[in-house]
Curated annotation (Swiss-Prot):
Keyword Aminoacyl-tRNA synthetase: no
Annotated protein name in UniProt: Cytochrome c oxidase copper chaperone
Entry keyword Membrane: no
Amino-acid positions noted as binding Cu cation in the UniProt annotation, renumbered to this chain: C28, C29
Organism (species): Schizosaccharomyces pombe (strain 972 / ATCC 24843) (Fission yeast)
Top-level taxon of the source organism: Eukaryota
Length: 70
C-alpha cells in the first residue's frame, strides 16, 4: 500500500490568481463570488445601482486584478 500525500492546495480557498498569471480566466469565470453577490443584489433590489454600489465596486476591483476594465 502506498500512502499518497498530496500538496495542500485545497487550503487555498477564494484566493485570486496572480496578476501575471499565464492562464487568464475568461471574464465570466474570473470572480464568481463577487459576481454572484452583485447579481443577487441587483435582482432583489428596486434601485440596484444605488443599493448595490459596494458590491458592484468589489466586483470591479476583483476583475481589475485579472486585468479586466469593467
Amino acid at each position: 500500500m502506498s500512502s499518497s500525500t498530496e500538496p495542500s492546495t485545497a487550503t487555498k480557498v477564494s484566493e485570486p490568481a496572480p496578476i501575471a498569471s499565464e492562464e487568464k480566466p475568461k471574464p465570466c469565470c474570473a470572480c464568481p463570488e463577487t459576481k454572484q453577490a452583485r447579481d443577487a443584489c441587483m435582482l432583489q433590489s428596486s434601485n440596484g445601482p444605488i443599493e448595490c454600489a459596494k458590491l458592484i465596486e468589489a466586483h470591479k476591483k476583483c476583475m481589475a486584478q485579472y486585468g479586466y476594465e469593467v
